[in-house]
């Protein structure tokens, strides 16, 4: 069967530069890597093709020969002494060089000697009220997670027995296989990368070193915490496998929308509707605040819609600070509805005796508009 074109294999144009080649290879190699596709022959074949294509095209001399002669340049010794493999370390060194930053030095899943694995990080979503965010609280949560097995103390082995080094990989958790030009390192199929096998598994955890259980945890929520804040509880995630360290638990907080207040950082906003007569004649009203007290707001006569009154230090506490935000009262003027005959007569009479001085904004606006359009 004819070999696929190297450029098509990587999904790049023949004019692709080194950066484009590397980016295409990285995406495809991550997608078809044997560790992510165990026992998948098609993925393994695709992975080998990707490796071969990238190795040839990243080398300027090999790429020039391929561009001129195609695959024939590498058949029957066509490359002379230049078509060998990799100098020192084989393909895994190249793979680790490219993916090192993402793979933590080329070893995924944070395994250590003896097959110990760090437990997974867990996420817990918690919703609190604005009042709770204002005052802070200590919450009790129940989290289903994996904990260290109390029978084998996390080793995974039956009490009185010990895990043994894997005979296939000699305890390394990795095996190498020669594939033409390449030496590919992959997870040991016998121990699945742990480096050890457990001949006599623990009867409770079946060799995993951990069991699933629901735990109760206390979470401290500080005053002033904001919507979307993440709280990290170190070591409270999933237990590590076979004695490995535990992961972390992340609490993602959301604050419920409040019936009266909207929050912007440490400041609070409250829209308060008042009657037309209160706006015109002035008056007072009380506002309940989150600290449990009431604040009196004085409305001067002639107050317009949209007017804001600031209540200093009546907002939210600033997280880990002695400062406090402000509460802003935003005035909305309610227009009377369902008027009685007498009310209508009084308003009509008021309209008749009103002057420009009573409504300077509307009078001035319409005068300016008329002048603008009529000249």
Curated annotation (Swiss-Prot):
**Where does it localize?**
Cytoplasm
* Zinc finger (CR-type) stretch: 136-214
Query: What Gene3D superfamilies does its record include?
Result: DnaJ domain (1.10.287.110), Heat shock protein DnaJ, cysteine-rich domain (2.10.230.10), Urease metallochaperone UreE, N-terminal domain (2.60.260.20)
Q: Name one Pfam family in it.
A: DnaJ_C
Q: Where does Zn(2+) 2 bind?
A: 166, 169, 188, 191
Mapped CXXCXGXG motif repeat ranges? 149-156, 166-173, 188-195, 202-209
Question: Which biological processes are named by the entry's GO terms?
Answer: chaperone cofactor-dependent protein refolding; DNA replication; protein refolding; response to heat
* InterPro entries, alphabetized: DnaJ, DnaJ_C, DnaJ_domain, DnaJ_domain_CS, HSP40/DnaJ_pept-bd, HSP_DnaJ_Cys-rich_dom, HSP_DnaJ_Cys-rich_dom_sf, J_dom_sf
Please list the cofactors this protein needs: Zn(2+)
- Extract the signal peptide range: none
Family of the protein in this entry? Belongs to the DnaJ family.
Q: Which HAMAP family match?
A: DnaJ
Describe its function. Answer: Participates actively in the response to hyperosmotic and heat shock by preventing the aggregation of stress-denatured proteins and by disaggregating proteins, also in an autonomous, DnaK-independent fashion. Unfolded proteins bind initially to DnaJ; upon interaction with the DnaJ-bound protein, DnaK hydrolyzes its bound ATP, resulting in the formation of a stable complex. GrpE releases ADP from DnaK; ATP binding to DnaK triggers the release of the substrate protein, thus completing the reaction cycle.
Q: What is the protein's name according to its record?
A: Chaperone protein DnaJ
- What's the source species for this entry? Rhizobium etli (strain CIAT 652)
